Regions:
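Short functional linear segments
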Residues: 1-47, 54, 60-67, 72, ...
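ATP-dependent carboxylate-amine ligase catalytic core
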Residues: 28-38, 64-154, 172, 200-201
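Nucleotide phosphate-binding/pyrophosphate-handling subdomain across enzymes
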Residues: 39, 132, 136-139, 147-160, ...
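Hydrophobic alpha-helical packing residues
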Residues: 58-63, 129, 374
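Beta-strand->loop->alpha-helix junctions that form or flank phosphate-binding loops
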Residues: 72-74, 196-197, 209-231, 248-252, ...
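Acidic, Mg2+-coordinating active-site environments of NTP-dependent enzymes
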Residues: 110-113, 120, 132-140, 156-245, ...
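C-terminal helical cap/extension that packs against the catalytic core
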Residues: 199-218, 232-233, 300-303, 309, ...
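Glycine/aspartate-rich loop-and-adjacent alpha/beta segment that forms the canonical ThDP
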Residues: 412-428
């Protein structure tokens, strides 16, 4: 397969088979590939929000320390190759094609089992990390934790649990304690756990899992993380003995994501050559697209992948912090299986205009239906829907013409199209 064929192959698998939780098929698939994951040590990351950003911070720190580090995140936002990072760069198109070919052949040889697209993408990550000789690799769980395809690994040296809130409730449960129990499934004996402060109902299963695994739990409390300065270029954060951490990633959630990475690096420094300078430099150099990503101009444009109530709430905080009382224009698309009514309630109270779009996803909510839901809650708000094939692009044209800051949000799936529009219109 070449790169395009590899992409098309995985998309075909995705269209034929959806989410299936469980580890048996993944174990069988990896056995066919001679278990490359056993050659690498892992840092597992689970949580509802902040996984990718935390993984990005920690990747940067470990890279500064000279450690050969890999990172696997999902879903892809701007490119299929961005999910796979090792030793300073993302996977090349030729490596991607070679890896997918190997995984597809292994999948085809299984007796009566068809691995999902996510399982095969995860297998590609394991294959790639082994090929590149990674010393450590950071694994972001795709859904939950305990029964997620990433959780077949047995060489975990550290587990990180980010902010937990209500999402994927039909699969993970309708109580925060149930969701947290799934996330806590990544905890392994002998691998220290770093966890951001959670609601008590969420902390209980995490503490229980750490105790059962007889492994230390390091809790990062939000009142230990102090943002002392913030503008459109950076924020300055104090976390315990780490003073004046410079964050180039914007947004109200980033200080706690950075603190999790700092705490993880501090724990890992007992076994790896990580110094304070590596932590400071790594934090400052971290970039992660689609997370309160600011493009300054006339007007400013923010790209944010917030897609659940907690993420939307943090987005609102960030918008208020940056723009104050300035009217905001939103370009929004959502997936129909999300709690969009609560997201509407949280976000649009101070909007000047909302332009709704239909995301490029089989799970998409139609832009007209989203408009109706917004008007039901905010009858006086000006809402315009764009239904055409180029609706996302038309919505952006309409939004920037208002000359107010533009916030693009609701789902990660619309961000690639928006960024392509920005590139074509000299706004990047």
């Amino acid at each position: 397969m070449d790169f395009l064929e590899a992409q098309n192959y995985l998309e075909k698998v995705r269209s034929q088979k959806g989410i299936v939780l469980g580890l048996d098929t993944m174990r069988h698939l990896m056995a066919k590939l001679n278990n490359p994951q056993d050659k690498v040590k892992f840092i597992q990351v689970a949580g509802t929000n902040g996984k990718g950003s935390t993984a990005a911070y920690l990747t940067s720190i470990l890279s500064e320390a000279g450690i050969k580090v890999g990172r696997y995140t999902s879903p892809a936002v701007f490119s299929s190759t961005e999910q796979y990072f090792a030793c300073g760069s993302c996977i090349s198109e030729s490596e991607y094609a070679k890896g997918v070919t190997a995984v597809a052949e292994a999948a085809a040889s299984l007796d009566g089992e068809t691995p999902t697209a996510f399982e095969q993408e995860t297998a590609l990550a394991f294959w790639y990390f082994a090929q590149k000789g990674c010393e450590l690799a950071i694994l972001e769980a795709g859904l939950g934790g305990d029964m997620d395809a990433t959780n077949i690994v047995t060489t975990t040296v550290c587990s990180i649990i980010t902010s937990i809130s209500m999402d994927h409730c039909r699969i993970l449960g309708n109580k925060i304690s149930e969701i947290a129990a799934h996330k806590a499934g990544i905890i392994k004996p002998g691998a220290p756990v770093i966890c951001i402060e959670q609601k008590e109902d969420a902390m209980e299963p995490i503490r229980a899992a750490a105790k059962a695994a007889d492994t230390p739990l390091y809790e990062v409390h939000r009142d230990e993380v102090r943002q002392i300065f913030s503008d459109k270029r950076e924020s300055i954060v104090f976390f315990r003995e780490f003073e004046n951490l410079h964050l180039k990633m914007l947004g109200s959630c980033q200080p706690e994501n950075a603190a999790l990475a700092v705490q993880a690096a501090s724990v890992l420094s007992r076994s790896y050559p990580i110094e304070k300078k590596h932590i400071y430099d790594g934090i400052e150099k971290t970039r992660w697209g689609g997370r309160f990503e600011l493009h300054s101009g006339s007007p400013d444009i923010i790209l944010d992948g917030a897609h659940n109530p907690d993420g939307i709430r943090r987005l609102r905080e960030s918008v208020n912090q940056m723009f104050g009382a300035v009217p905001i224009c939103y370009v929004c698309g959502v997936l129909a299986d999300k709690d969009y009514e609560k997201e509407i309630e949280i976000l649009f109270g101070r909007a000047s205009n909302v332009f709704t779009v239909t995301p490029p996803s089989p799970r998409a909510m139609k832009s007209t239906d989203l408009k109706a839901a917004i008007k039901k809650r905010f009858s006086q708000l000006k809402v315009t829907s764009f239904d055409s094939e180029d609706g996302i692009e038309k919505a952006m044209e309409a939004a920037v013409s208002q000359n107010n800051p533009v916030v693009v949000c609701g789902t990660l799936t619309i961000l690639a199209r928006v960024k392509e529009w920005m590139k074509c219109n000299n706004r990047l």
